[in-house]
């Protein structure tokens, strides 16, 4: 593991709730109005709030970017491009969906399969796609695992053509929400918005800073509570978290969560209960929050040490908190967690 330095922060600056932000400014132009415009809607299986200093019509356009993408990548919508491929074994992806597929497969390769877009049948067997939770028989899991192998997906990035083996189901959900937030943010930028915060059910994408020049304050949830444990100061980046607390069920005294290990077909038992990724690319952050959770702390820290495009916050099952060195001057513990020891992972 990379070198870890232990520091204790005894002061805190509670700026906002978990994965939310607020800000004001004195400029009254449309792109930096004194109060943000906002819209709330439900998409991608979560409640979404877009807030921006700009015209509300532009926000509605950003919403359309997201909902249009959702329709194209849904595993269950019979009109989606991904659904068509899963039903027919092949098909052609267009535009942003093709771009998303290319990105997803790149992340599968970079994480050595800790992220795998063909994990859907395993997730379904555990009931996380329907809410009918169950612990599947080991024989069921073993029968499904041979089709969990992203390397068997044939994709031509030039034509968008995709072919998958019989019995395989692909799902871009592990990267789609972060990618959608990124695309929506780019739409806002292209339409003159310089200050915004997009909250996709806890996946946060920021544009610029607040109108007064100060960074956005994004809360990181305590995995064992209902309040933020720390607040990050963020400018023009994405902040995306994967945690075992997000979706889980209990059976016979055991807790099972939705983040699956592609190697075992079981919930990832990596010693981590929460991973937050901060970076410029929302899709990358989304993919890494899941895959680094699967890897566990040591492998995740080594992966970070060999990268230069993201920072991370790790919370272990035992309650230890680790941050990578790029965040050491960008966080503050909340009052309720002021005595928490935070260990800094350095290169």
Kindly label every feature range from the protein language model.
Residues 2-11, 15-347:
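Mature catalytic core of soluble alpha/beta enzymes
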């Amino acid at each position: 593991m990379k070198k870890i330095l232990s520091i204790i922060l005894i002061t805190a600056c509670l700026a906002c709730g978990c994965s939310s932000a607020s800000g004001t400014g004195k400029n009254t132009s449309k792109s930096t109005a004194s109060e943000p415009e906002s819209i709330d809607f439900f998409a991608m299986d979560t409640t979404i709030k877009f807030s921006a200093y700009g015209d509300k019509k532009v926000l509605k356009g950003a919403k359309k970017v997201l909902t249009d993408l959702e329709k194209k990548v849904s595993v269950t919508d019979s009109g989606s491009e991904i659904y068509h491929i899963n039903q027919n074994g092949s098909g052609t992806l267009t535009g942003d969906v093709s771009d998303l597929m290319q990105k997803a497969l790149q992340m599968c390769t970079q994480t050595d399969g800790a992220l795998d877009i063909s994990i859907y049948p395993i997730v379904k067997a555990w009931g996380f796609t329907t809410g009918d939770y169950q612990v599947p028989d080991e024989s069921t899991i073993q029968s499904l695992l041979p089709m969990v192998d992203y390397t068997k997906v044939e994709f031509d990035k030039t034509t968008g053509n995709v072919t998958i083996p019989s019995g395989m189901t692909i799902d871009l959900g592990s990267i789609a929400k972060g990618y959608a937030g990124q695309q929506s943010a780019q739409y806002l930028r292209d339409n003159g918005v310089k200050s915004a915060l997009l909250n996709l059910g806890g996946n946060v994408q920021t544009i610029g800073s607040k109108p007064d020049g100060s960074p956005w304050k994004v809360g990181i949830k305590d995995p064992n509570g209902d309040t933020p444990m720390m607040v990050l100061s963020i400018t023009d980046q994405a902040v995306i978290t994967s945690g075992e607390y997000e979706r889980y069920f209990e059976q016979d005294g055991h807790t099972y969560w939705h983040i699956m290990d592609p190697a075992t077909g079981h919930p990832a038992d990596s010693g981590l209960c929460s991973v937050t990724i901060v970076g410029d690319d929302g899709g990358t952050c989304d993919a890494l929050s899941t895959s680094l959770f699967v890897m566990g702390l040591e492998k995740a820290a080594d992966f970070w040490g060999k990268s230069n495009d993201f920072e991370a916050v790790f919370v272990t099952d035992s309650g230890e908190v680790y941050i990578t060195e790029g965040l050491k001057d960008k966080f503050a513990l909340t009052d309720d967690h002021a005595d928490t020891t935070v260990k800094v992972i350095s290169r």
